[in-house]
Amino acid sequence: MNLVKIEKKWQKIWEQNEVFKVKEILNKIKRYILPMFPYPSGKAHVGHVRNYTICDVIARFERSQGHNVLHAMGWDAFGLPAENAAMQNNTYPNSWVSSNVDVMRQQLKAIGLSYDWSREIITCSSQYYVHEQRFFLEMLKKGLVYQKESLVNWDPIDQTVLANEQVINGKGWRSGAIIEYRNLKQWFIKITNYADALLKGLDSLKGWPESVKTMQKKWIGQSTGININFQLKGIEASVKVFSTRPETLFGASFIALSYNHNLVQQYVNTTPETQKFIDKCSNVGTSNVNIDKMKIAVLTNLKVIHPLNSSIELPVILSNFVLMDYGTGALFGCPAHDERDHEIAKLLKLNIKQVITSTERNIDVLKEAYVGDGIMINSFHLNGLTTTEARQKVINELQHKNIGQQVTNYKLKDWGISRQRFWGCPIPIIHCKSCGAVPVPYEDLPVILPEHGVEFTGKGNPLDNHHSWKYVKCPKCHLDAVRETDTFDTFFESSWYFARFCNPTSDDMVDAKAAKYWLPVDQYIGGIEHAVMHLLYARFITRVMYDLKYIDIQEPFTSLITQGMVLHRTYQDKSNNWLYPNEVEVDSNGQLRCKADLQYVTVGKLEKMSKSKKNVVDLELVLKLYGADVARMFVLSDTPPEKDLEWSTEGIEGCYKFIQKLYNFALKLKNINLTDNKIDKVLLSKTHKTIKNVTQDIISCRLNKAIARLRELYNLIFKMSELTVQIKESFLILIRLFNPFIPHLSEEIWSLLSGRGEMLVELPWPKYEEKYIHEEEHITIAIQINGKLRSLYNCLIDTPEHDVQSAILKLEQVKKHIGDKEVRKCIFVPNKLINIII
């Protein structure tokens, strides 16, 4: 059996017959199945195999249901790696990207993925991004785009600005560099205009994992509270403070300002201590990450008057946990009932006053903050009220005195889309000294990147130094002007590509007719790491496209699967150099050694496959040794799609052996003339039950369970004492059920045995009959003695423990192993095993 040869044969047949090419058929139910498209980094890896195979199984299954299936692939091709490769290899980024796309396309075809390749898109093509430039200008017209100077996340290695979502634990998401903070003029899109809609829209996404929705809710960060005016002592000015817990107002010990609050420059006396604090915040920023690492604060010369009791004065401090771009950039601190405030009070030796008591336990607020609800104390006229009652009473009182206003705030910030790099979509703006920022006229689009004379030095943006491209005439006054040299954040391209797949050759950004048929995406698949970047941006851009009448949907993805990662152990030699798995071998004692010098290697923990640690598996080698169907089956077996998968040679070899068994059994059936029409009721029941369960498993994306059920049916077929017509029919049903998982071999076996001319991929899904499933079904239970498998026992499904135990203790093989020893206990797992402890 030459699996690779079989796979190439069927891939050619599918391509020649355009099996997966689709068009809109209005009277046919559509299904749009889509994986997150990849960055063409060079080669596909086994992580890609898992993601795309999960998607492919669903697409093939939906096709077998008679649905019209759109399943497409493209390339998220802009980004820094191409620019870095251009610098290292002295080439143009497009050459590097094109070469990588050619390699990865062939790899994905070799896996047998059912894509409509006629819809392939690549985001670095001007035919793609011309629409993005027009869309940007449309948003500019609608007031959704603006430019301002702002404190930005600066990646010193990649030398570009990163969005907040791209800063992970204070480091650049791609380079890993510690982020710096700089004031730069940037372009922003007003995603905050859609904060409430994006938050409420999550409730409609019933097919999304709760974990992803929770992450987006936290990122949007809605909080309802009140802005309270505190009068500064001795100064004709006030500070507006945002609070979500106004009931704790009488427990306030301080007012905290952001280091860059406007009152700081106006009224705070500059001392060496305050200047040192301001300089530190300016250098390291006040991101949530930095706040979590270390909370710092400093007292100032200012005091405020308590709004509900003028005899109370509170000190004003500066602290890094107050963010100028959230709320008002000021808050009051109640150390007894807020953990963060408690830390600051301890640091500055400020008063800690309890104003809420628990009804359930004793609390000591000097030791730790009590953040729960309870009954108000030490709060004058609020004493005795519940926290809920007190909150509303304080809000009413503050509003009545015109010193408070209820507001809703969001942590979500506007999307900064400017990037100081070459390999991205040019921002279609021209800067003129007389006219300001002028949009490039539509007839002059696309603004294309220069293809010659670009110098990639690794420092700054090459577009700044490309004079023939940069210096142009103003479209309005025709005087000298300069192009915008920043390019779009690459998340812009991936925020609408799913709509382009509906018709990738349309003259419009989105073909309205095709989009009305295909959108939304019915099943989207990708990593959970995109929860608050790509997935949030795509939801936002979809709503903008809806408002601008491009499409008639408000949510892009009906259902979402976030597949787990593929893991592999890491290996290091005696010099702590990383080793590839194929550089390691097992010696006769079961120890791992380096093939090169036979020295022992250090085995690390299971980690996500990465080129830097060399714990990657060569996909081309896997396909060459085992074939695509084996790889597909392995990445789907044993582990649910949403869980991480450990790559193992033993596991993939086990799948290879099973597939060999399938093929050999098919050859056996082909070479025998079957005439026996005897019906085995157990096999009949098992076959129909398998159809039913596998169908439901695929619908619920329990693909590992589906494969387990298929293997169970095969085991029953294989164990039948004599071959019959019924066995062949059950085996052919098994092969049809296996088709989405191992499409090449299943097609080959079907063509060998069915005697029919159709391809499996064109046949409807098998149907079960409930009447057959009610027959009593036998199962095989494993018999273990002290945990070791000793025998097997066939019985009816759901046989009670007492009956199983009584029967197996009478078996000669079991009695032989027990001998004269006492049976201490039996561990019974229904329908699975019984373990006799002696």
Swiss-Prot record:
GO terms for cellular component: cytoplasm. The keyword Signal does not apply. It catalyses: tRNA(Leu) + L-leucine + ATP = L-leucyl-tRNA(Leu) + AMP + diphosphate. It is found in: Cytoplasm. Pfam families: Anticodon_1 (PF08264), tRNA-synt_1 (PF00133), tRNA-synt_1_2 (PF13603), tRNA-synt_1g (PF09334). Its EC number is 6.1.1.4. Its main location: cytoplasm. Keywords: Aminoacyl-tRNA synthetase, ATP-binding, Cytoplasm, Ligase, Nucleotide-binding, Protein biosynthesis. Signal peptide: none annotated. Belongs to the class-I aminoacyl-tRNA synthetase family. This is Leucine--tRNA ligase.
